[in-house]
């Protein structure tokens, strides 16, 4: 059965599954829906048009579904949608979307969101990501499945971080990180620069030697050759016809990401 602490304030219009837990001094607003087995910690606010799936752990002291920090926002009924089995730790803030974009901020399944993280309006976060403490992403950012953001990293609005990519701690990211790539600050400052393929992460997730070798070759063409961006992309695309179907899968994702970039890729 639902367990709501006597000091919590849950609006009668909120929709809570039978086994949701709401901790002391927490607030749940009228347009909130919370799925089975989700636990809301103490002193946590869940507001706005927010839908939360099953098996999540949120708080304490988190703020979920707050209005976007966008001066154009005019109280439109924009949304936040959170999937299943996410851990959202203390003092995290996640805001709803804006009508200037899709009107939805989304967080998938099985994500690990550590303390003091900020996920701004209109962001799209996939599945199995890790946001280390104090990682901050601005509005309209896209984060692919299995990506990792290091502690105290900052991401500029509209940037995309590809699947299985990794952003180092205390890094400032202003352009896209292709999938499977590590980007981190270096001795010259906090600006993120490319540091190779996330080989260890890919091995842990079951990528085979052929797939990793192909991605390393693609990285060399993109970052270590004298080719222009367009010529490197063409060479990587040509590789698709030279490898087997299994090896081509991550390579295809790499090519498609490059083709879709609007801000350019991290350099």
Curated annotation (Swiss-Prot):
GO CC aspect terms: cytoplasm; membrane
EC number(s) from the headed UniProt entry: 2.3.1.129
SUPFAM superfamilies to which the protein is assigned, alphabetical: Trimeric LpxA-like enzymes
Principal location class: cytoplasm
Pathway the protein takes part in: Glycolipid biosynthesis; lipid IV(A) biosynthesis; lipid IV(A) from (3R)-3-hydroxytetradecanoyl-[acyl-carrier-protein] and UDP-N-acetyl-alpha-D-glucosamine: step 1/6
PROSITE patterns: HEXAPEP_TRANSFERASES
CDD domains named among the record's database cross-references: LbH_UDP-GlcNAc_AT (cd03351)
Catalytic activity entry: a (3R)-hydroxyacyl-[ACP] + UDP-N-acetyl-alpha-D-glucosamine = a UDP-3-O-[(3R)-3-hydroxyacyl]-N-acetyl-alpha-D-glucosamine + holo-[ACP]
GO annotation (BP), single: lipid A biosynthetic process
Subcellular location: Cytoplasm
Highest taxon of the lineage: Bacteria
Pfam families: Acetyltransf_11, Hexapep
GO MF term list: acyl-[acyl-carrier-protein]-UDP-N-acetylglucosamine O-acyltransferase activity
InterPro entries assigned to the protein according to its UniProt record, in alphabetical order: Acetyltransf_C, Acetyltransf_C_sf, Hexapep, Hexapep_transf_CS, Lipid_A_LpxA, Trimer_LpxA-like_sf
Coiled-coil portions: none
Keywords: Acyltransferase, Cytoplasm, Lipid A biosynthesis, Lipid biosynthesis, Lipid metabolism, Repeat, Transferase
Stored PANTHER family: ACYL-[ACYL-CARRIER-PROTEIN]--UDP-N-ACETYLGLUCOSAMINE O-ACYLTRANSFERASE, ACYL-[ACYL-CARRIER-PROTEIN]--UDP-N-ACETYLGLUCOSAMINE O-ACYLTRANSFERASE, MITOCHONDRIAL-RELATED
UniProt family annotation: Belongs to the transferase hexapeptide repeat family. LpxA subfamily.
Assembly, per entry: Homotrimer.
Function: Involved in the biosynthesis of lipid A, a phosphorylated glycolipid that anchors the lipopolysaccharide to the outer membrane of the cell.
Name of the protein this chain belongs to: Acyl-[acyl-carrier-protein]--UDP-N-acetylglucosamine O-acyltransferase
Taxonomic lineage of the native organism: Bacteria, Pseudomonadati, Pseudomonadota, Betaproteobacteria, Burkholderiales
Gene: lpxA
């Amino acid at each position: 059965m639902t367990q709501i602490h006597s000091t919590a304030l849950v609006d009668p219009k909120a929709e809570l599954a039978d086994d949701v837990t709401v901790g002391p001094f927490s607030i749940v607003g009228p347009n909130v829906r919370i799925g089975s087995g989700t636990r809301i910690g103490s002193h946590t606010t869940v507001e706005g048009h927010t839908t939360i799936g099953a098996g999540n752990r949120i708080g304490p002291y988190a703020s979920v579904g707050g209005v976007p920090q966008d001066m154009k926002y005019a109280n439109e009924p924009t949304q936040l949608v959170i999937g299943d089995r996410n851990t959202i730790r203390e003092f995290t803030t996640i805001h709803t979307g804006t009508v200037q974009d899709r009107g939805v901020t989304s967080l998938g399944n099985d994500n690990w969101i550590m303390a003091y993280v900020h996920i701004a309006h209109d962001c799209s976060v996939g599945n199995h990501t890790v946001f280390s403490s104090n990682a901050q992403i601005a509005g309209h950012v896209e984060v692919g499945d299995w990506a990792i953001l290091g502690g105290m990293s900052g991401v500029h609005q509209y940037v995309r971080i590809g699947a299985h990519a990794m952003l180092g701690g205390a890094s400032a990211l202003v352009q896209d990180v292709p999938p499977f790539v590590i980007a981190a600050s270096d001795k010259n400052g906090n600006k993120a620069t490319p540091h190779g393929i996330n080989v260890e992460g890919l091995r842990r997730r079951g990528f085979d030697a052929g797939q990793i070798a192909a991605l390393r070759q693609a990285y060399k063409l993109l970052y270590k050759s004298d080719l222009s961006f367009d010529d490197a992309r063409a060479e990587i695309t040509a590789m698709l016809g030279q490898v087997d179907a299994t090896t081509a899968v991550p390579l295809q994702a790499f090519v498609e990401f490059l083709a879709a970039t609007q801000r350019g890729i991290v350099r």
